[in-house]
């Protein structure tokens, strides 16, 4: 049945909107001091890594990025047909400089036009070869250019890299100092007890359950003995 008072209540058909505050954990990188100094806490992980010139994930992005369509990629590319006949009239007059002859009063009498009105490049090459005299060879001009050298390319690549990447590469290229391992007194005592009981028989040392309870291998015991100077 139910209470009559509850039945008489006016229910609202509109649902109550509740906003939940999502507490995002602020990323605090602790792996590298270089990355921690350049980290911006107001940006996401992907934004920070893209600013550093690094990749946040080794795999491709599954989503969240706007993909360019094939039509957008080829929108700015115009394909020219080499066999197509193009009109010489472009709709606008081309402004260029010409030589003129003037009379005594300053009026233009004659316009000196070029011998190549169609701008044929072969005509210019032929006229240059006929008119010009052979010039003495300059050894500096005869040097063949083989492109940008590897050192120059490396310098350009280094200058275009972000500062964080350059500092990380410098840190990674530093030689790592090898840690020298010293044998403790207890280890030397254990090795001396093995030598006193078995001599040079390393195989017997491996099978000894009491003196070798940790089941050290033959190669490991041999290396320890040679390091201590107890085995030649």
Curated annotation (Swiss-Prot):
Chain intervals with Basic and acidic residues compositional bias: 132-154
Superkingdom in the source lineage: Eukaryota
UniProt keyword annotations, A-Z: Nucleus, Ribonucleoprotein, Ribosome biogenesis, rRNA processing
Ranges for region Disordered: 1-20, 113-161
A GO CC term attached to the entry: nucleolus
Biased composition (Basic residues): 1-14
Compartments, as annotated in UniProt: Nucleus, Nucleolus
InterPro entries: Ribosome_biogenesis_Nop16
Presence of keyword Methyltransferase: no
Keyword Nuclease found: no
Biological processes annotated in GO: ribosomal large subunit biogenesis; rRNA processing
Chief location bin: nucleus
Main function: Involved in the biogenesis of the 60S ribosomal subunit.
PANTHER family given in the database record: HSPC111 PROTEIN-RELATED (PTHR13243), NUCLEOLAR PROTEIN 16 (PTHR13243:SF1)
Family: Belongs to the NOP16 family.
Subunit structure: Component of the pre-66S ribosomal particle.
Protein name: Nucleolar protein 16
Organism: Neurospora crassa (strain ATCC 24698 / 74-OR23-1A / CBS 708.71 / DSM 1257 / FGSC 987)
Lineage: Eukaryota, Fungi, Dikarya, Ascomycota, Pezizomycotina
Gene name in the database record: nop-16
